[in-house]
């Protein structure tokens, strides 16, 4: 036993020495290269490798932590995402204090690329909500604990934010069930970037059809109210969509119809948009929004079991919609999968032909030929991604209790 421990110590010491020698050779080799050449090399490396290089040289750290470099690195990652799309799967581990796992999936190879597990100082309690990605950064929110975190899975950095004024007010109020029904917020916060990063929280303040909006200022580390607010109550059970500097929400039903509320994140002014006239449903829980190619899209999610799913896109003029995809939901055959989740538990999940007749959320367009869909298993056991091309399913990735977001990695977080 002692001999084995000594051998392990020798092997560990040898490996450490080898790494130091490799880094030393790298430092010597790179010192003979012009700074701009070294920077170009860094731009082609993944974030994980760059984080290691930061500790090897003060000059390298200065380069890698500069806003100029991080923005160039992000643009390259965004261009790469077009040809080599990736998504982030966010899952929660069921403990008294929930751990949250971020896993990157390649949609080309249908494989996991990297993962990061966060155990926050103040644990979350179910349910938790994750925002869409903004430069590879996410906002994680727990209504029960009132905790809000901004998280960068690539660098494993996170920052806790102070509670919104709405949260403080509700905590002091100790509301009744009727009060909660009137003041129920949109659970999903919107995390966007104008000149600086912004966190936007829209909620219904009372029964008199008044809506309030709070914006978190990262520089001031404080929440503030927007004075120009929509005169419509917002449908609470939705995830806001973001495209071209605008955020979108559904209103509650008015006179048997719903509308789309839009917020310009630069001017912080709201405007009202119509929904596609050919989408028959007037119930906001029966339709959904998504972003495809940086444009707002809409589709029906409920109603009679439909074989065909239609996806509509808002035109740039914002006065009309156009149908861009018609998807046959029965293009997939019976299948089963072995699922490896973020905690090394293997499960067996089955989908039948009946399960497939459920509207799916478009995630991305892959090389202009395939549309990538996130499909919720009808028994609510999880989600899967499916890639459709000309009514032919190519691949599936089932993921238990997952939020699925597009992903680009941001190296630094100085702006927030």
Swiss-Prot record:
Residues 27-76 form the F-box domain. InterPro entries: F-box-assoc_dom_typ1, F-box-assoc_interact_dom, F-box-like_dom_sf, F-box_dom, Gal_Oxase/kelch_b-propeller, Kelch-typ_b-propeller, SCF_F-box_component. One of its GO terms (cellular component) is plant-type vacuole. PROSITE patterns: FBOX. Kelch repeats lie at residues 199-243, 297-341. Pfam families: F-box, FBA_1. Keywords: Kelch repeat, Repeat. The keyword Transport does not apply. NCBIfam families: F_box_assoc_1 (TIGR01640). This is Putative F-box/kelch-repeat protein At1g12870. It comes from Arabidopsis thaliana.
């Amino acid at each position: 036993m002692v001999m084995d421990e000594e051998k392990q110590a020798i092997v560990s010491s040898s490996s450490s020495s080898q790494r130091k020698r490799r880094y030393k050779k790298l430092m010597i080799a790179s010192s003979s290269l012009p700074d701009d050449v070294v920077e170009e090399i860094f731009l082609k490396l993944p974030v994980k490798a760059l984080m290691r290089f930061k500790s090897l040289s003060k000059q390298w750290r200065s380069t890698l932590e500069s806003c100029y470099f991080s923005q160039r690195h992000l643009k390259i990652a965004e261009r790469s995402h077009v040809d080599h799309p990736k998504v982030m799967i966010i899952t929660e581990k069921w403990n008294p204090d929930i751990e949250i796992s971020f896993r990157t999936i390649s949609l080309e190879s249908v494989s996991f690329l990297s993962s990061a597990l966060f155990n926050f100082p103040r644990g979350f309690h179910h349910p938790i909500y994750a925002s869409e990605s903004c430069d590879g950064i996410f906002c994680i929110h727990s209504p029960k604990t009132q905790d809000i975190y901004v998280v960068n899975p690539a660098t494993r950095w996170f920052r806790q934010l102070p509670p919104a004024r709405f949260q403080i007010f509700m905590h002091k109020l100790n509301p009744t069930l009727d009060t909660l029904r009137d003041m129920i917020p949109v659970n999903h916060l919107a995390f966007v970037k104008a000149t600086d990063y912004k966190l936007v929280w829209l909620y219904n303040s009372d029964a008199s059809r008044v809506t309030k909006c709070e914006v978190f200022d990262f520089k001031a580390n404080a929440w503030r109210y927007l004075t120009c607010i929509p005169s419509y109550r917002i449908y609470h059970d939705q995830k806001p969509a973001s495209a071209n500097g605008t955020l979108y929400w559904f209103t509650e039903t008015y006179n048997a119809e719903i509308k789309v509320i839009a917020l310009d994140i630069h001017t912080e002014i709201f405007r009202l948009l119509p929904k596609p006239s050919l989408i028959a449903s007037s119930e906001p829980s029966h339709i959904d929004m998504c972003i495809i190619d940086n444009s707002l899209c809409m589709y029906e999610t409920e109603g009679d079991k439909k074989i065909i799913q239609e996806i509509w896109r808002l035109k740039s003029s914002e006065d009309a919609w156009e149908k861009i995809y018609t998807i046959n939901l029965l293009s997939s055959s019976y299948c089963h999968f072995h699922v490896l989740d973020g905690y090394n538990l293997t499960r067996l999940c089955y989908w039948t032909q009946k399960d497939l007749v459920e509207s799916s959320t478009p995630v991305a367009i892959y090389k202009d030929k395939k549309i990538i869909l996130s499909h919720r298993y009808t028994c609510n056991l999880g989600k899967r991604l499916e890639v459709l091309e000309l009514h032919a399913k190519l691949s599936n990735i089932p993921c238990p209790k997952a939020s699925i977001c597009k992903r680009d990695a941001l190296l630094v977080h100085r702006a927030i």
